[in-house]
């Protein structure tokens, strides 16, 4: 009888886990660079491209820097409606809303992506409220709708989401994603929309109120990574998870004890705040600190991009984040990004987040790619452990 109960518990746990394969594709930065548009983007956006105001705290509107999504390379699939309409999205722990382009959107960015057709879904319910997010110098606007959302065969009923009818500039036009699915706390959501993961919890679709993220940093691998909703994969990391308490519920915000370069504490000597964000590819920090950090690691500024010849990586120092008493080190090979042609760009970027939310550091994919990350809503904490890299051979539960 005891063995039967153990087996039953295991089966129940597996049933409540949703494994979402992540694909790794070219980032907007690489696409824009190949098309010769990157320097124009830096010039056009100016400082606003690298600033985030505290207006994101308002439930009616939000402000996001375009730079957050410029380097994102990891995407997953969802569907909305009945019959299902497919979309490629960023699973973003730095925001809380779900939005996709609407068929009524005529912006260039929309016409090049999958667009939601409410009239073709038998489960669609109109909401009609306006939706607004500011991205850099442009705005994403739309209306709210309600429909079922499916992630890897698991369907969330009555999910409120945004249908964008206008998207900013030409930047999203070159992106590999249609929309964004936010995984942050509900109080960060525009228009007080309940996030998808919160509805999964409320509708008993996941076994545990947490999720794990693995990002494969090998550019030659077909396996981009995996998002596990309702659990985490112990085979993806070594040792034990180091649990870090959330300091402010909104973003997945934590305390960083200090930041070292070559073993010497340079930044955050008295501690500082950081958010763990799958929707930001790089590691960002206050622009003054990041400029110093670029000098410490030895990269040079060329047309707004910091980098060096890849042949010099062995001469560069490691950068270490001390979090909850443990050191998380990144080698030059881990924090520098190979752009091709023997050039490597810095994985650090200046981003000024104004008070009261900031200043903040953002631990994006450059960090998460080296440390498996578990986001635990039930206990309001984040767990980290060194990633174990291996190729995925099956999609088993």
From Swiss-Prot:
GO terms for molecular function: aspartic-type endopeptidase activity. Glycosylated. Contains high mannose-type oligosaccharide. It is an enzyme of class 3 (hydrolase). Its EC number is 3.4.23.34. Transmembrane segments: none annotated. Found in the larval foregut and adult stomach. Disulfide bonds join 105-110, 268-272, 310-344. InterPro entries: Aspartic_peptidase_A1, Aspartic_peptidase_AS, Aspartic_peptidase_N, PEPTIDASE_A1, Peptidase_aspartic_dom_sf. Keywords: Aspartyl protease, Disulfide bond, Endosome, Glycoprotein, Hydrolase, Protease, Signal, Zymogen. The keyword Acetylation does not apply. Gene3D superfamilies: 6.10.140.60, Acid Proteases. GO terms for cellular component: endosome. Residues 17-49 form a propeptide. Residues 1-16 form the signal peptide. It catalyses: Similar to cathepsin D, but slightly broader specificity. Its main location: other. Glycans are attached at residue 139. Pfam families: A1_Propeptide, Asp. Homodimer; disulfide-linked. May have a role in immune function. Probably involved in the processing of antigenic peptides during MHC class II-mediated antigen presentation. This is Cathepsin E. It comes from Aquarana catesbeiana (American bullfrog). The lineage of its organism: Eukaryota, Metazoa, Chordata, Craniata, Vertebrata. The gene is CTSE.
């Amino acid at each position: 009888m005891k063995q039967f109960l153990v087996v039953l518990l295991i089966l129940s746990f597996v049933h409540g886990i949703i494994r979402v394969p992540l694909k790794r594709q070219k980032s907007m930065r690489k696409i824009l660079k190949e098309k010769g548009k990157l320097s124009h983007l830096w010039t056009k956006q100016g400082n606003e491209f690298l600033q985030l105001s505290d207006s994101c705290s308002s439930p009616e509107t939000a402000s996001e820097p375009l730079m957050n999504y410029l380097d994102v390379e990891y995407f997953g699939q969802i569907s909305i409606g009945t019959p299902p309409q497919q979309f490629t999205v960023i699973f973003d722990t730095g925001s809380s809303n779900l939005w996709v382009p609407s068929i009524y959107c005529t912006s260039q960015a929309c016409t090049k992506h999958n667009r939601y057709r409410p009239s073709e879904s038998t489960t669609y319910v109109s909401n009609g409220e306006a939706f607004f997010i500011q991205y850099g110098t442009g705005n994403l606007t739309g209306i709210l709708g309600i429909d079922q959302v499916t992630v890897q065969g698991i369907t969330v009923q009555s999910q409120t989401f945004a249908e964008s009818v206008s998207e900013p500039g030409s930047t999203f036009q070159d992106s590999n994603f249609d929309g964004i699915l936010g995984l942050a706390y509900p109080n960060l959501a525009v228009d007080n929309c309940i996030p998808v993961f919160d509805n999964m919890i409320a509708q008993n679709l996941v076994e545990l109120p947490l999720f794990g993220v693995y990002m494969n940093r090998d550019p030659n691998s077909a396996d981009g990574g995996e998002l596990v909703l309702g659990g985490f994969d112990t085979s993806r990391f070594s040792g034990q998870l180091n649990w870090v308490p959330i300091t402010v519920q909104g973003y997945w915000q934590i305390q960083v004890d200090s930041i070292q370069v070559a073993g010497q504490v340079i930044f955050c000597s008295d501690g500082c705040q950081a958010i763990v964000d799958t929707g930001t590819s790089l590691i960002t920090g206050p622009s003054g600190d990041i400029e110093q950090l670029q000098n410490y690691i030895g990269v040079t500024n060329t047309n707004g991009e910091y980098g060096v010849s890849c042949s010099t990586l062995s001469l560069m120092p490691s950068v270490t984040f001390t979090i909850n008493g443990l050191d998380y080190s990144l080698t030059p090979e881990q924090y520098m990004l190979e752009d091709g042609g023997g050039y490597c760009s810095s994985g650090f970027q200046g981003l000024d987040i104004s008070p009261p939310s900031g200043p903040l550091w953002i631990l994006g994919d450059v960090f998460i790619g080296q440390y498996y990350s578990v986001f635990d809503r039930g206990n309001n904490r984040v767990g980290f452990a060194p990633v174990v890299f291996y190729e995925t051979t099956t999609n088993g539960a």
